[in-house]
């Protein structure tokens, strides 16, 4: 238990020391290891349990297991010491240091810091850009950073020229062209008229052809009937003679 006095690093092993400790507790994010010779426990984060990806620390270690660890970090936060340990840089069978020059540890620490800096900058910039000044009512800065004088002109963030060009292009592309629609309608109407004229001409020609055919048939029938009458008359004359 904490007696109320700030913790000290006097009884802790030196940085990059390798020792064997007992697993005191397993969580979703890592395992806490008892440090020999002191009451403090160190955390082995799941990213430092193995060189392979670890999703469940309980699949790697269990409470009471003895593991080899390397002390890779000590820091004081709110009068409490946080000790970081690593299992993957130590051979779990022999306790041999697999990263004697601490190259792996330094690379991961550098990567972690750059990631934290990037996310912090991104969040800060977005917060500032989306903030509306209470003093002038413009976006992009806080009231404490506002230089506007009472009755003076207001200044706000101006969008980039490229963004304006892209927006204008998209607007032009989306807007219908009034000059194109009438011409298209006229073309369609002309096509419809041509189609109708063709149909009417075809129907007229077919009607005329049918009429001429009927007339030809009628004349041929009349000529045949006249020939038959002539033959009958000739036959009657011969019979009288």
Curated annotation (Swiss-Prot):
<keyword id="KW-0539">Nucleus</keyword>
<keyword id="KW-0007">Acetylation</keyword>
<protein>
    <recommendedName>
        <fullName>Zinc finger CCHC domain-containing protein 17</fullName>
    </recommendedName>
</protein>
<dbReference type="InterPro" id="IPR001878">
    <property type="entry name" value="Znf_CCHC"/>
</dbReference>
<dbReference type="GO" id="GO:0005730">
    <property type="term" value="C:nucleolus"/>
</dbReference>
<keyword id="KW-0862">Zinc</keyword>
<dbReference type="Pfam" id="PF00575">
    <property type="entry name" value="S1"/>
</dbReference>
<dbReference type="GO" id="GO:0008270">
    <property type="term" value="F:zinc ion binding"/>
</dbReference>
<feature type="domain" description="S1 motif">
    <location>
        <begin position="16"/>
        <end position="88"/>
    </location>
</feature>
<feature type="compositionally biased region" description="Basic residues">
    <location>
        <begin position="182"/>
        <end position="198"/>
    </location>
</feature>
<dbReference type="GO" id="GO:0022625">
    <property type="term" value="C:cytosolic large ribosomal subunit"/>
</dbReference>
<dbReference type="InterPro" id="IPR012340">
    <property type="entry name" value="NA-bd_OB-fold"/>
</dbReference>
<feature type="region of interest" description="Disordered">
    <location>
        <begin position="161"/>
        <end position="241"/>
    </location>
</feature>
<feature type="compositionally biased region" description="Basic and acidic residues">
    <location>
        <begin position="211"/>
        <end position="225"/>
    </location>
</feature>
<feature type="modified residue" description="N6-acetyllysine">
    <location>
        <position position="144"/>
    </location>
</feature>
<keyword id="KW-0863">Zinc-finger</keyword>
<comment type="subunit">
    <text>Interacts with PNN. Associates with the 60S ribosomal subunit.</text>
</comment>
<keyword id="KW-0687">Ribonucleoprotein</keyword>
<keyword id="KW-0479">Metal-binding</keyword>
<feature type="modified residue" description="Phosphoserine">
    <location>
        <position position="114"/>
    </location>
</feature>
<dbReference type="GO" id="GO:0042802">
    <property type="term" value="F:identical protein binding"/>
</dbReference>
<feature type="modified residue" description="Phosphoserine">
    <location>
        <position position="183"/>
    </location>
</feature>
<feature type="zinc finger region" description="CCHC-type">
    <location>
        <begin position="131"/>
        <end position="148"/>
    </location>
</feature>
<dbReference type="GO" id="GO:0003723">
    <property type="term" value="F:RNA binding"/>
</dbReference>
<dbReference type="InterPro" id="IPR003029">
    <property type="entry name" value="S1_domain"/>
</dbReference>
<feature type="compositionally biased region" description="Basic and acidic residues">
    <location>
        <begin position="166"/>
        <end position="178"/>
    </location>
</feature>
<dbReference type="GO" id="GO:0043489">
    <property type="term" value="P:RNA stabilization"/>
</dbReference>
<feature type="compositionally biased region" description="Basic residues">
    <location>
        <begin position="226"/>
        <end position="241"/>
    </location>
</feature>
<dbReference type="InterPro" id="IPR047913">
    <property type="entry name" value="ZCCHC17_S1"/>
</dbReference>
<keyword id="KW-0597">Phosphoprotein</keyword>
